[in-house]
UniProtKB/Swiss-Prot annotation:
One GO BP: protein import
Family per record: Belongs to the TolB family.
Keyword Cell division appears in the UniProt entry: yes
Full protein name: Tol-Pal system protein TolB
Task of the protein: Part of the Tol-Pal system, which plays a role in outer membrane invagination during cell division and is important for maintaining outer membrane integrity. TolB occupies a key intermediary position in the Tol-Pal system because it communicates directly with both membrane-embedded components, Pal in the outer membrane and TolA in the inner membrane.
Gene this protein is translated from: tolB
Subunit structure: The Tol-Pal system is composed of five core proteins: the inner membrane proteins TolA, TolQ and TolR, the periplasmic protein TolB and the outer membrane protein Pal. They form a network linking the inner and outer membranes and the peptidoglycan layer.
Single GO cellular component term: periplasmic space
Pfam families the UniProt entry points to: PD40, TolB_N
Cellular localization per UniProt: Periplasm
InterPro entries: 6-blade_b-propeller_TolB-like, PD40, Tol-Pal_TolB, TolB_N
Species annotation: Shigella dysenteriae serotype 1 (strain Sd197)
Region forming the signal peptide: 1-21
Annotated keywords: Cell cycle, Cell division, Periplasm, Signal
Length: 430
């Protein structure tokens, strides 16, 4: 917890520009298919009202994962304040085999102790499956809540939780001197802040694997340029500003390289920069357009979009040489892939029959599953644990962000109130 807090502390310098017009998750479908679980309101041991609804945040996290269906508070059979007070039979009668209880205690120095216990109410009734406690200041109460959610999620699923992650995205606001804003928020839309404002378009944010930097495209110089911005101090490093197009940045998983697309010789082609030396080498060539690189876990291979067969399809290439290999065959066209951190599957924009949706492809079998049902879906980005995808779609006259689970069962929206939202990018674990 302490190490994670140190990583997150780097964002505090930007929180002076936290916005009130935040995105919030609105669930559309799929919760009923999740595993039932009980999350009891955390017991508050101080005067007045609790400073944060920790239990509510944990319940929302588990619900937002698409894998759990927390029991509504009005239906809770009891509200125990500790593991010892849990009556397993009352919960198992409702089909619930695990319950989260917790306590929040104020300290004289203004900090808070947050504790939780995950209690088995099924197989081994009354057994504490997981527990932890954290001492945090008020501004870190949501972070402590997400930490508890991560631990509960991992204990019950075997999958590392991703509730302490963030998302970056571009908002085109409704006028003003700087209508384009690169923003970052918690994964659930809270604690939104502005990373960069611009009078010209901003595009394609990409996270460094340690979560400390964002690469993105800016047009502030009158033409496209690739830059890397350090979030802790705002320092900006220009990476590429060649004639014509500079775009689609992607950090390698080992953090040593940045892949991107340039059209300085005519057609779009892929290039890779060694970030330590600044040396750039070309990966693809020819007359076709090659763009939208995404890395495989080995930091040696890229999936990318190419129109070399006529329509856009996804190909794989080794950055050290060799011919690209086509890896998508279903649908009229496929593009803008994002490979999972374990290299087992990818998500992409797949078009067929006039529809453009987010699809998942198994990289071993080639099997494809359409995940989304929204309109003109684009720019999918995977959560670091591979369980969820965030993407943008058209709604009315604008663009909004959407979430879908990688099994396709859970769908939600993150509507913004002050502009169109595009180019979402899910952070690594923070």
């Amino acid at each position: 917890m302490k190490q994670a807090l140190r990583v997150a502390f780097g964002f505090l310098i930007l929180w002076a520009s936290v916005l009130h017009a935040e995105v919030r998750i609105v669930i559309d479908s799929g919760v009923d298919s999740g595993r039932p679980i009980g999350v009891v309101p955390f017991q508050w041991a101080g005067p007045g009202a609790a400073p944060e609804d920790i239990g509510g945040i944990v319940a929302a996290d588990l619900r937002n994962s698409g894998k759990f269906n927390p029991l509504d508070r009005a239906r809770l059979p009891q509200q125990p304040g500790s593991a010892q007070e849990v009556q397993p039979a009352a919960w198992s009668a409702l089909g619930i085999d695990a319950v989260v209880v917790g306590q929040v205690t104020p300290n004289p120095d203004g900090s808070y102790n947050v504790a939780y216990q995950l209690v088995d109410t099924g197989g081994a009734p009354g057994t504490v499956l997981a527990q932890n406690s954290y001492k945090v200041n008020k501004q870190w109460l949501r972070y402590a809540s997400h930490t508890a959610s991560d631990e509960v999620f991992e204990k019950l699923t075997g999958i590392k939780g991703a509730f302490r992650t963030r998302i970056a995205y571009v908002v085109q606001t409704n006028g003003g001197q700087f209508p384009y804003e690169l923003r970052v928020s918690d994964y659930d839309g809270y604690n939104q802040f502005v990373v960069h404002r611009s009078p010209q378009p901003l595009m394609s944010p990409a996270w460094s694997p340690d979560g400390s930097k964002l690469a993105y495209v800016t047009f502030e110089s009158g033409r496209s340029a690739l830059v890397i911005q350090t979030l802790a101090n705002g320092a900006v490093r220009q990476v590429a500003s060649f004639p014509r197009h500079n775009g689609a940045p992607a950090f390698s998983p080992d953090g040593s390289k940045l892949a991107f697309a340039l059209s300085k010789t005519g057609s779009l082609n892929l290039y890779v920069m060694d970030l330590a030396s600044g040396q750039i080498r070309q990966v693809t060539d020819g007359r076709s357009n090659n763009t939208e690189p995404t890395w495989f876990p080995d930091s040696q291979n890229l999936a990318f979009t190419s129109d070399q067969a006529g329509r856009p399809q996804v190909y794989k290439v080794n950055i050290n040489g060799g011919a690209p290999q086509r890896i998508t065959w279903e649908g009229s066209q496929n593009q803008d892939a994002d490979v999972s951190s374990d290299g087992k599957f990818m998500v992409m924009v797949s078009s067929n029959g006039g529809q453009q949706h987010i699809a998942k492809q198994d990289l071993a079998t080639g099997g494809v599953q359409v995940l989304s049902s929204t309109f003109l879906d684009e720019t999918p980005s995977l959560a670091p644990n591979g369980t969820m995808v965030i993407y943008s779609s058209s709604q009315g006259m604008g663009s909004v962000l959407n979430l879908v689970s990688t099994d396709g069962r859970f769908k939600a929206r993150l509507p913004a109130t002050d502009g169109q939202v595009k180019f979402p990018a899910w952070s690594p674990y923070l």
